[in-house]
Amino acid sequence: MNTLVNILFILVPLLLSVAYLTYFERKVLAAIQLRHGPSVVGPFGLLQPFADAIKLLIKEPIIPFRASTILFIMAPMLTFILALIAWAVIPFGAEVIVENGQQVIIPKVIANINVGVLYVLAISSLGVYGVIIAGWSSNSNYAFLGAIRSAAQMISYEVSIGLIVAAVVITTGTLNLGEMVVAKHNMPFWVDLLLMPIGIIFFISLLAETNRHPFDLPEAEAELVSGYNVEYSSMPFALFFLGEYANMILASAMMTIFFLGGWYPPLEFSLLYKIPGLIWFVLKIVILLFIFIWIRATIPRYRYDQLMRLGWKVFLPISVLWVILISGVLLFTGNLPGSNV
């Protein structure tokens, strides 16, 4: 029963967050472009996400004549479900209890497993299958080309993401996401400075991994007419749409855990610790989501060759070099977990 309550406690706010992220994006883009944005449905346009959802619900789903029906329907469901189940291991706070006279920090998470990092990486890697299935089953040249682009792009940047996460794991000595946040919080400040350059690379790689601007080549409107989801309408299209925004929130949560201190306040002031950790966690995610949208409004789209060159010839060598550098520095200074055993 407690597990079900925890799942609902995560799932319901997450679905509402995904819905209102679309509203937030339209409002931010409108402000940057000196427009009003959604302002008709409800006060300040706050009911616009529900109006969009109702519109998509009552529209008729159209399946192309030559499409593989089962795979065509399964692809958006797979994409959306994978974006949600990754949250099972994301810690959004912690509580401190006393056992045998010692303080023990217990993360607030649905499944506090010791291989949480591997779980998140595995689930995020599976997302490419939904895109590939959608492109192939649509029997459309535009959709298939968009799916191939997406697969190549996601696989290319997953290599850098994996190496950067490996550097964080080496630094903290754990694959448990909650323990990782606590370990990073207790480390010297210079370790955070050492991780900062690859933190920037990690965030840029997340833009490519989530197919967001300026790396949204799989759904380049001018070339591929929306890309891999061009044949979708009604709720199947909405599931792809929600999956993309759910992945944005998940990517921001991963960035927060790996590099921004998770639920801890940014500065060591006792006054800041009176604010609940959940508030800090959500605030950091919102700031990162704003940066996602800000980048979309200001930076032009990369060419495909530039995208591949950046991933393989720039990010990959830097990531490999930084893993070696961090390991050497931590070993030399005696801060490498397990080096003094």
UniProtKB/Swiss-Prot annotation:
GO molecular-function term, one example from the UniProt record: NADH dehydrogenase activity
Species of origin: Wolbachia pipientis wMel
Keywords, in A-Z order: Cell membrane, Membrane, NAD, Quinone, Translocase, Transmembrane, Transmembrane helix, Ubiquinone
Record Pfam families: NADHdh (PF00146)
Oligomer and partners: NDH-1 is composed of 14 different subunits. Subunits NuoA, H, J, K, L, M, N constitute the membrane sector of the complex.
Cellular component GO terms held in the UniProt record: plasma membrane
Entries under NCBIfam families matching the protein: PRK06076.1-2, PRK06076.1-6
EC numbers: 7.1.1.-
Family annotation (PANTHER family): NADH DEHYDROGENASE SUBUNIT 1, NADH-UBIQUINONE OXIDOREDUCTASE CHAIN 1
Gene Ontology BP terms: aerobic respiration
The protein's name: NADH-quinone oxidoreductase subunit H
Subcellular location field: Cell membrane
Domain of life: Bacteria
Main subcellular location of this protein, as a coarse class: membrane
Topology term for the membrane: Multi-pass membrane protein
